């Protein structure tokens, strides 16, 4: 991209170096008109020519809300059943103002787009970043009950959820339950059964942990 239009396709810090909200050395500047055009036209091509019926955006928070909403509306014209979702966070800070980022806290401004629910994930199994911390499923009932409830109501406003007891946010952010994707484990971090082995207190045989794994 830089060979095409130097300095245009990637965001820069004040000193001119590449910003790195992706954690991979750079980040595309989706808020710029031709970067936005490239992203949207690429997705439309894949949907039309390859009949792809769902798009997952890694570190979706790098992109701006306007681009994601435009992309969603264009896909609706092709096939209203196409699913759009992503990771509602960034790997590091970005020059893009927080209120413009397509992060989970702003998903209420992105109708028809879903985000992963890391509150429910870590509430149920324990912290992804602390291998020995247990979650609700492994006995940490008091400390992780609210994040589990938050997942049950789909990240929406509900009178039975104490939002002050959440792990990473203090308010509901989904406009509808369909915008919240509950999950427990994925390609990142430990598999669920390995996380249980590390976090469940005491010595437990595999035949004791497997039922917990299946229950979750």
Spans of features found by a protein language model:
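Substrate-binding/active-site clefts of carbohydrate-active enzymes
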Residues: 1-50, 63, 67-79, 83
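Active-site-proximal loop/turn and secondary-structure-junction residues that shape catalytic pockets
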Residues: 61-63, 90
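Conserved alpha/beta catalytic core and glycan-binding cleft of carbohydrate-active enzymes
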Residues: 72-216
